[in-house]
């Protein structure tokens, strides 16, 4: 997974995610992840260029740009979506990471 692209993608995601209260860099399923409290809210897939986030609006995102926002059968029954980090804008990535953080964050952090 350690490629030049992955390093750039990791830096892109971490520069946003680590600014949210209570966020730590961690791992999940042996890949880099970001957690709030003990809950993962974003993680890299094994390919190093796809990110998993939680969202309640995935249909909207996938309809808007199916090349960038998608799911696999594994995520069909979860409120999660995959993001192609080579395609996503920084604005959309920031919005999706923040929404995912809000879904997973403890209530005490949401008040900050």
What would you call each of these model-derived segments?
Residues 1-112:
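Charge-dense, helix-prone N-terminal extensions
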């Amino acid at each position: 997974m350690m490629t030049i692209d992955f390093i750039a993608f990791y830096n892109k995601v971490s520069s946003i995610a680590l600014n949210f209260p209570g966020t730590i860099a961690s791992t999940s399923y042996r890949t880099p992840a970001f957690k709030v409290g003990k809950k993962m809210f974003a993680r890299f897939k094994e390919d190093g260029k796809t990110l998993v986030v939680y969202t309640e609006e995935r249909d909207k995102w996938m309809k808007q740009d199916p090349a960038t926002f998608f799911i696999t059968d594994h995520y069909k029954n979860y409120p999660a979506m995959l993001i192609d980090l080579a395609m996503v804008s920084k604005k959309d990535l920031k919005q999706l990471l923040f929404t995912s953080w809000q879904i997973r964050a403890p209530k005490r952090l949401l008040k900050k």
